[in-house]
C-alpha cells in the first residue's frame, strides 16, 4: 500500500501547488449537446427570461425536440419536449412535411414563438415551414399546424434563418433553382410567416473551398456588431470533412437585398482542425450576462462521418477584430473551456458511462473512504456516481467524486496494466491525473498521466461491482467512457 510518508509528501506538494489550476466550476467540455445521441444543425436562442432554448436536427429526421436550459454550456442536459412530428402519411409536392425534417430554428417575434424548419415529401421537394406557439414558455402550450414560408419562386429551400435588422424582419435560406447550385437567398418579410416578393441571391459558391464534394452555400446565420451585419454560411458538401463556415459582411445601413452590398471573406471563418471534421451549420448567441458572443456549431469526431448521426454540438467564444468576428480553430472536445460569462460557478457533474456495459463509474461505499475500490454499477443517481472534471494543467483533469471529494487514483502509483483504480484524497500526484482522448464517437478514452495507459472496465465485465482498473490501450468498448453531464 502507499506509505504514509509518500502520502504526506504528496499532500505537501499539493498544498504548495494549490490555486495554480483552474477550478471545474469555471470550465466545461465540448460537446455540449445531448450525450447519448447526435445534435446536428444546432440553434440556440437566449431569451429575455434568462433561459436558453435549443433545437437541432433529430437523429431520424422525423421530429423537432426543444430543450430549455438555464445555462449555455448545459443546454443538452434537460429532457427534450417534442413540439412537432412529421406527417404520418407520405405525400408529394411542394407542400409536404412527411420526411427530412431538417435544421429547426426557434425565434421569439412580436410576442410569439416560431420554429422554422425545412421538410419534404416523397419527391424531395424541400420547402421551409413555420409553427407558432403563443405560450410564454414554448416547452408548454400547443404549436400550430405548419405553414409554408416561401418567396414568389417557391423553389427548393432549406436551412432558413430569420432576424430583425434595423427594424426590418428578414429571412435568409439556401436555394436551388434555375439549374444553379445551392446559393444563399435573402428577402424581407411582412410578417413572421410571409416573405415579400422574390428573394435576392447574395452568395454563390465561387471559391474552391466552397466546392469540395459539391458547390454548396447553405445554413446562413446573422450576427450584428457595431456598424456591420455579418452572415455566416456553410460551404461544400456536408458529407465531406471539408464542410466549413464562410462569412459575408455588409454595412448595417446598406441595402441588404443588393448583392453588391455584401463582401465575402476570402478565407473560411471555421474549418476542420483539432479533431473536428466538417464543422458547420452554426448559430450565434450571447453569454448569460450579454457581454460575450458565442458560436454554436456541429462537427464530426472522425474523418468520413459526413452528414450522419455522429455530428455533435460544440460551442466556443467569439472574439472581434474591430467589427469582424474571429472564431479561430475548433476547440478540441474533452478540453477545459472557460464557461460563458455570467453562467455561474456551480460545480458541473458528470456520470461516466462505460460503452461496453452501460454501467457508470461508482465507488464501493461499504469500504473505508480512503482506498475504496472504484467499480461500475447501474446508475441510481447516487453521489458516488457523479464526478467533476477539475483541470490541473496541460490538458489533464482530476476526477472528483461528489460523494466525499476524493479523486480517482491509480493504486500505489503503479504503471502496470491491471492496477486497480481507487478513491483517495487529492495529493496533486500524476497517478491522480487523467486526460480525455477523443475516439471516433462521443465516447472518450481516459489516459492516466503517470502510467500512460487507460481507464478500463476489467475483463469487459457486465456486472454491478465490476472492477475499474488501468490497462494498455486497445481501443475496445471496455475502455470507452461517455461523460454525461447531469446538471
PLM regions with names:
Residues 344-487:
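Lectin-like carbohydrate-binding module/patch detector with strong preference for beta-trefoil
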Residues 5, 25-26, 229, 266, ...:
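Generic, low-specificity signal for short hydrophobic/alpha-helical stretches with a mild N-terminal bias
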Residues 1-9:
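Bacterial N-terminal signal peptides that target proteins for export
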Residues 17-21:
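N-terminal signal peptide c-region/cleavage motif recognized by signal peptidases
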Amino acid at each position: 500500500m502507499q506509505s504514509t510518508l509518500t502520502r504526506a509528501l504528496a499532500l505537501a506538494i499539493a498544498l504548495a501547488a494549490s490555486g495554480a489550476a483552474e477550478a471545474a466550476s469555471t470550465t466545461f467540455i465540448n460537446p455540449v449537446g445531448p450525450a447519448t445521441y447526435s445534435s446536428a444543425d444546432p440553434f440556440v436562442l437566449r431569451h429575455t427570461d434568462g433561459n436558453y432554448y435549443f433545437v437541432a436536427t433529430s437523429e431520424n429526421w422525423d421530429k423537432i425536440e426543444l430543450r430549455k436550459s438555464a445555462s449555455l454550456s448545459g443546454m443538452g442536459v434537460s429532457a427534450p419536449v417534442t413540439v412537432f412530428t412529421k406527417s404520418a402519411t407520405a405525400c408529394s409536392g411542394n407542400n409536404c412535411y412527411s420526411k427530412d425534417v431538417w435544421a429547426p430554428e426557434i425565434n421569439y417575434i412580436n410576442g410569439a414563438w416560431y420554429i422554422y424548419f425545412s421538410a419534404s415529401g416523397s419527391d424531395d421537394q424541400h420547402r421551409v415551414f413555420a409553427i407558432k406557439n403563443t405560450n410564454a414558455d414554448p416547452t408548454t402550450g400547443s404549436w400550430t399546424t405548419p405553414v409554408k414560408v416561401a418567396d414568389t419562386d417557391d423553389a427548393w429551400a432549406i436551412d432558413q434563418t430569420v432576424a430583425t435588422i434595423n427594424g426590418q424582419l428578414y429571412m435568409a435560406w439556401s436555394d436551388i433553382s434555375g439549374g444553379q447550385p445551392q446559393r444563399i437567398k435573402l428577402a424581407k418579410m411582412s410578417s413572421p410567416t410571409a416573405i415579400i416578393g422574390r428573394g435576392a441571391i447574395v452568395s454563390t459558391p465561387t471559391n474552391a473551398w466552397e466546392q469540395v464534394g459539391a458547390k454548396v452555400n447553405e445554413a446562413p446565420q446573422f450576427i450584428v456588431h457595431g456598424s456591420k451585419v455579418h452572415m455566416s454560411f456553410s460551404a461544400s458538401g456536408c458529407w465531406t470533412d471539408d464542410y466549413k463556415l464562410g462569412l459575408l459582411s455588409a454595412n448595417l445601413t446598406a441595402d441588404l437585398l443588393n448583392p453588391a452590398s455584401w463582401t465575402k471573406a476570402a478565407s473560411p471563418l471555421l474549418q476542420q482542425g483539432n479533431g473536428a471534421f466538417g464543422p458547420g451549420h452554426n448559430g450565434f448567441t450571447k453569454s448569460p450576462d450579454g457581454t460575450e458572443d458565442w458560436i454554436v456549431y456541429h462537427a464530426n469526431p472522425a474523418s468520413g462521418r459526413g452528414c450522419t448521426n455522429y455530428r455533435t454540438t460544440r460551442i466556443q467564444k467569439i472574439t472581434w477584430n474591430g467589427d469582424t468576428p474571429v472564431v479561430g480553430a475548433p476547440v478540441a472536445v474533452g478540453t477545459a473551456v472557460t464557461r460563458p460569462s455570467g453562467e455561474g460557478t456551480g460545480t458541473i457533474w458528470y456520470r461516466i458511462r462505460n460503452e461496453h456495459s452501460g454501467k457508470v463509474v461508482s465507488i464501493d461505499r461499504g469500504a473505508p473512504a480512503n482506498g475504496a475500490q472504484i467499480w461500475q454499477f447501474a446508475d441510481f443517481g447516487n453521489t458516488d456516481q457523479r464526478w467533476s472534471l477539475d483541470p490541473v494543467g496541460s490538458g489533464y483533469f482530476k476526477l472528483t467524486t461528489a460523494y466525499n471529494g476524493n479523486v480517482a487514483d491509480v493504486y500505489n502509483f503503479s504503471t502496470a496494466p491491471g492496477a486497480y483504480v481507487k478513491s483517495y484524497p487529492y495529493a496533486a500526484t500524476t497517478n491522480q491525473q487523467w486526460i480525455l482522448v477523443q475516439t471516433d464517437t462521443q465516447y472518450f478514452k481516459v489516459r492516466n498521466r503517470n502510467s500512460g495507459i487507460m481507464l478500463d472496465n476489467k475483463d469487459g465485465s457486465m456486472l454491478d461491482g465490476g472492477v475499474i482498473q488501468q490497462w494498455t490501450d486497445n481501443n475496445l468498448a471496455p475502455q470507452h467512457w461517455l461523460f454525461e453531464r447531469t446538471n
